[in-house]
Amino acid sequence: MQCALYDAGRCRSCQWITQSVNEQLSAKTADLHRLLAGLPVEQWCSPIGGPEQHFRNKAKMVVSGSVEKPLFGMLHRDGTPVDLCGCPLYPASFAPVFSALKPFIARAGLTPYNVARKRGELKYLLLTESQFDGGMMLRFVLRSETKLTQLRAALPWLRAQLPQLRVITANIQPVHMAIMEGETEIYLTDQQALAERFNDVPLWIRPQSFFQTNPTVASRLYATARDWVGQLPVRHMWDLFCGVGGFGLHCATPQMQLTGIEIAPEAIACAKQSAAELGLTRLHFQALDSTQFATAQGETPDLVLVNPPRRGIGKPLCDYLAQMAPRFIIYSSCNAQTMAQDIRHLPNYRIQRVQLFDMFPHTAHYEVLTLLCRL
């Protein structure tokens, strides 16, 4: 992939950009083999790749500059701003949004936050696009509610320019730290969730719910999990760290009993909405801590699917799963190192199948799906 920002030395986020996609995939595969060394794997499935560019469905932009000439991108360690509007990871549909937002910021009087001076209001712009219908969600991350009235007053102009903006919010992040969002979310539109659809499964994206940033590869990840589960005798399943329910909603059948657990209430609201649309009455999603939920249960499901954050599921949950001993475990991980550590804490399981998904091209990161079977 050619990137003018990288060539000019202005951005180094894509550290592997000088390697071909095939070289990147080979290096990631070798890394996964290294991490799972000593753990016998019955079947290595071929890795799954995706688009080289324009694949990312989300932009997280630091806003700097002035209210008359705002700049969207990032700040170097020394505070130097870099405009990332031309990043080739973004789809072409983002460009007109960025172009319209620059004069809008002046209209609304949203002074960019100055980190050095600790002054200003607008900290970040967070933009998400649905590949299903092209609808977008825009979040203004503000230091306070001071400019809310001005923001609301200026919105009709922005919505006339960008009718694809379905969900617009103001997130309040008052802390002088590099934190992307605060707890308070103020909706500025009637619609509060963005409609998405993978493999004919309806999904919803709300402001504070995690959603994969590479929809092409994510849809194949979910479809693969559905295929694997469909080959197993599963009547009762847990989906832990379930997010908006992507895995569970793909894997569930009308006959299956499935419980999805996720600590973020916004994500659970999305999952419940999808389950209702699908008419799956035996799906139950709850906003709880996954480890606390699992260790408090007296019943053993046929299959436990886990999709934890980078830190992994941790030894307490590993120990409980080893003791509870469901027949199958599917582990989806964005950090194969912690996944390998967790699997080593499950000595009564064998690895039946492993597949790598290149969710994060041009970086060392990748997603991996692993099927474990009880010995």
UniProtKB/Swiss-Prot annotation:
Its EC number is 2.1.1.189. It holds the Pfam family tRNA_U5-meth_tr. It comes from the Bacteria. SUPFAM superfamilies: S-adenosyl-L-methionine-dependent methyltransferases. One of its GO terms (biological process) is rRNA base methylation. The active site is at C334 (nucleophile). Gene3D superfamilies: 2.40.50.1070, Vaccinia Virus protein VP39. Signal peptide: none annotated. S-adenosyl-L-methionine binds at Q212, F241, E262, N307. [4Fe-4S] cluster binds at C3, C11, C14, C87. PANTHER family: RNA M5U METHYLTRANSFERASE, TRNA (URACIL(54)-C(5))-METHYLTRANSFERASE. Catalyzes the formation of 5-methyl-uridine at position 747 (m5U747) in 23S rRNA. Belongs to the class I-like SAM-binding methyltransferase superfamily. RNA M5U methyltransferase family. RlmC subfamily. HAMAP family: 23SrRNA_methyltr_RlmC. This is 23S rRNA (uracil(747)-C(5))-methyltransferase RlmC. It comes from Salmonella dublin (strain CT_02021853). The lineage of its organism: Bacteria, Pseudomonadati, Pseudomonadota, Gammaproteobacteria, Enterobacterales. The gene is rlmC.
